[in-house]
Curated annotation (Swiss-Prot):
Thiamine diphosphate binds at E29, L58, A59, E60, Q82, F86, I87, M88, P89. This is 2-oxoisovalerate dehydrogenase subunit beta. One of its GO terms (molecular function) is 3-methyl-2-oxobutanoate dehydrogenase (2-methylpropanoyl-transferring) activity. InterPro entries: THDP-binding, Transketo_C/PFOR_II, Transketolase-like_Pyr-bd, Transketolase_C. The active site is at H129. The gene is bfmBAB. It comes from Bacillus subtilis (strain 168).
Length: 327
């Protein structure tokens, strides 16, 4: 077991899956010789060649469409959108085609495509390089949406996504790429899509979150532990479909629940999590469900001070946790 960065774990997962299965190939903008703008595909072109690591035009609808067609033909495409913000031209392909192929063909066709995309702010990317788009797709049966927080989870879940028989959107927080490091087993392992993970056991309050915010919650929990407040931290890992059993269990355990997302609040993944808790845990709650999210404004600002105001961070999570604990 070695320690590696979040992005290296993603790169390794693709490499191992391409070695394991000749049907797996990568396509996207600058994924070839350049290795991707974040170097997520570095070294793949040199090892597998241009037939399996394909540079594409700047046309996200084409990237998705070609990948969907290849998946229906029996291949295992990993289609990279350079930034999650740019996935919008491909929405019709993903929602109208990939998500519905199995249903409308009465199981005659499947679409085992993985669409990877870096999301999130904190890197001064402003309007078109900082968005969180997961909620746009999170009411489309037929899709799965995975958003890992650690290198270990990233590798295991990406492998699972490649082997899945249906389309998977795999969103990676770009700020986590080199910031987050962790132990990753050398052996071949997969993690189940659709299952949350308890990252920290606690008894006083529950924090449910995903992606980079998991690390903020863990940092805040360590601070609160010194004051005798025990936080239970749950990482959703898959944001669609949600692990309802894990959500209900975590909410019922403490009776005080904080939901954290970098996305804007209204209509977010956490809105659905709150609905699940309200429907199933109402009489187990000792406080109103609390949400911490980005402000409901059109886009992430560019100015560093304004970006900081928008972003969730450990201090904001800690303050929200303290307020909830004191209720």
């Amino acid at each position: 077991m070695s320690v590696m960065s979040y992005i290296d774990a993603i790169n390794l997962a693709m490499k191992e899956e391409m070695e394991r299965d000749s049907r797996v190939f990568v396509l996207g903008e600058d994924v070839g010789r350049k290795g991707g703008v974040f170097k997520a595909t570095a070294g793949l072109y040199e090892q597998f060649g241009e037939e399996r690591v394909m540079d594409t035009p700047l046309a996200e609808s084409a990237i998705a469409g070609v990948g969907i067609g290849a998946a229906m033909y029996g291949m295992r495409p990993i289609a990279e959108m350079q930034f999650a913000d740019f996935i919008m031209p491909a929405v019709n392909q993903i929602i109208s085609e990939a998500a519905k192929i199995r249903y409308r063909s009465n199981n005659d066709w499947s679409c085992p495509i993985v669409v990877r995309a870096p999301y999130g702010g904190g890197v001064h990317g402003a309007l078109y390089h900082s968005q969180s788009v997961e909620a746009i797709f999170a009411n489309q049966p037929g899709l799965k949406i995975v958003m890992p927080s650690t290198p270990y989870d990233a590798k295991g879940l990406l492998k699972a996504a490649v082997r899945d028989e249906d389309p998977v959107l795999f969103f990676e927080h770009k700020r986590a790429y080199r910031l987050i490091k962790g132990e990753v087993p050398a052996d071949d392992y997969v993690l189940p899509i659709g299952k949350a993970d308890v990252k920290r056991e606690g008894d006083d309050i529950t924090v449910i979150t995903y992606g980079l915010c998991v690390h903020f919650a863990l940092q805040a929990a360590e601070r609160l532990e010194k004051d005798g407040i025990s936080a239970h931290v749950v990482d959703l890992r898959t944001v669609y479909p949600l692990d309802k059993e894990a959500i209900i269990e975590a909410a019922s355990k403490t009776g005080k629940v904080l939901l954290v997302t970098e996305d804007t609040k209204e209509g977010s993944i956490m809105s659905e999590v709150a609905a699940i808790i309200s429907e199933h845990c109402l009489f187990d709650l000792d406080a109103p469900i609390k949400r911490l999210a980005g402000p409901d404004i059109p886009a992430m600002p560019y100015a560093p001070t304004m970006e900081k105001y928008f972003m969730v961070n450990p201090d904001k999570v800690e303050a929200a946790m303290r307020e909830l604990a004191e209720f």
